[in-house]
Curated annotation (Swiss-Prot):
InterPro entries: CVC, HD, Homeobox_CS, Homeodomain-like_sf, OAR_dom, VSX_homeobox_regulators. Disulfide bonds: none annotated. The keyword Transcription regulation applies. This is Visual system homeobox 2. PANTHER family: VISUAL SYSTEM HOMEOBOX 2. Residues 208-261 form the CVC domain. Pfam families: Homeodomain, OAR. GO terms for cellular component: chromatin; cytoplasm; nucleus. Residues 266-290 have a biased composition (Basic and acidic residues). One of its GO terms (molecular function) is DNA-binding transcription repressor activity, RNA polymerase II-specific. It comes from the Eukaryota. Abundantly expressed in retinal neuroblasts during eye development and in the inner nuclear layer of the adult retina. Within this layer, expression is stronger in the outer margin where bipolar cells predominate. A motif (OAR) lies at residues 304-317.
């Protein structure tokens, strides 16, 4: 009995050792429970109780062998040849299932799916985070490149009133007018220039809405004249002789006249432009009323008084120079007519031809 049982025990042990060595997979250790020792758990058949015994410690191995041996209890072991024949003779399907490659590849293949998805998800999240970082960096660079916005200037009612008055007088004020406005309104000159640009744009927009194309053309011509210091065309000046309202460019002439009046007030009115435009027509005087006529008469009186004062100053200067020069000036004045008479006598003699001289002789 003991020999046969030893052969039966030794045979599956050798087979399991050969299978474990041929498969290349190490023997897996199990617990110390009775079910695990007897192989009653739900693990695959590869975890044979004999293979589990090989992985046990020496003390536990002796105890397990004493239990499994045929002389363990009354000469008959718990596991005899007829007790559990499945542990001694393995069927073909158990041998196929006992292959370590087939056993271990399935869980690895199953686990590879979630691992791949987790890797792709992590890579996608990294790509999204990197793209977000790039976008944030580009947005920061764009904000740095942008210029800082200047605060809008808030004009007071007094400043707006003065600016509107100046705009009604001339849409293109020169440097002198802008400096005077800066002194009045206590604003910088560049702010005044920007205000005039915006006001001109607003005026053009309003005129376009009303459909005044001729006025817009005159406005563009006036702006070019002011920028490039171009005089008024002669055709416009000739048409102004009949009257500003009857001319081909009434708005342009009115603006030009306003600029001339502003220059006259500042004392920089050119003499050529004074004679270029005629005085105001009767129609304009009637439209403006008695107040405008009184203002014009006052301006004329002022100009006349200035001219009279200049004439008196010139007369006084000539008198002073005459008194300072004294008798020298008188001698020069007496010498001049004598020289003129001598020249008159010499001139006909020079002009006479020889036959005329013979006739005279």
């Amino acid at each position: 009995m003991t020999g046969k049982a030893g052969e039966a025990l030794s045979k599956p042990k050798s087979e399991t050792v050969a299978k474990s060595t041929s498969g290349g997979a190490p023997a897996r250790c199990t617990g110390f429970g009775i079910q695990e020792i007897l192989g009653l758990n739900k693990e695959p058949p590869s975890s044979h109780p004999r293979a589990a015994l090989d992985g046990l410690a020496p003390g536990h191995l002796l105890a397990a062998r004493s239990v499994l041996s045929p002389a363990g209890v009354g000469g008959m072991g718990l596991l005899g040849p007829g007790g559990l024949p499945g542990f001694y003779t393995q069927p073909t399907f158990l041998e196929v299932l006992s292959d370590p490659q087939s056993v271990h590849l399935q869980p690895l293949g199953r686990a590879s799916g979630p691992l791949d998805t987790s890797q792709t998800a992590s890579s996608d999240s990294e790509d999204v985070s990197s793209s977000d970082r790039k976008m944030s960096k580009s947005a920061l660079n764009q904000t740095k490149k942008r210029k800082k916005r200047r605060h809008r200037t808030i004009f007071t009612s007094y400043q707006l009133e003065e600016l509107e008055k100046a705009f009604n007088e001339a849409h293109y004020p020169d440097v002198y007018a802008r400096e005077m406005l800066a002194m009045k309104t206590e604003l910088p000159e560049d702010r005044i220039q920007v205000w005039f640009q915006n006001r001109r744009a607003k005026w053009r927009k309003r005129e376009k809405c009303w459909g005044r194309s001729s006025v817009m053309a005159e406005y563009g011509l006036y702006g070019a004249m002011v920028r490039h210091s171009i005089p008024l065309p002669e055709s416009i000046l000739k048409s102004a002789k009949d009257g500003i309202m009857d001319s081909c460019a009434p708005w342009l002439l009115g603006m030009h006249k306003k600029s001339l009046e502003a220059a006259a007030e500042s004392g920089r009115k050119p003499e050529g432009e004074r004679q270029a435009l005629p005085k105001l027509d009767k129609m304009e005087q009637d439209e403006r009323g008695p107040d405008a006529q009184a203002a014009i008469s006052q301006e004329e009186l002022r100009e006349n008084s200035i001219a009279v004062l200049r004439a008196k100053a010139q007369e006084h200067s000539t008198k002073v120079l005459g008194t300072v020069s004294g008798p020298d000036s008188l001698a020069r004045s007496t010498e001049k007519p004598e020289e003129e008479e001598a020249m008159d006598e010499d001139r006909p003699a020079e002009r006479l031809s020889p036959p005329q001289l013979e006739d005279m002789a």
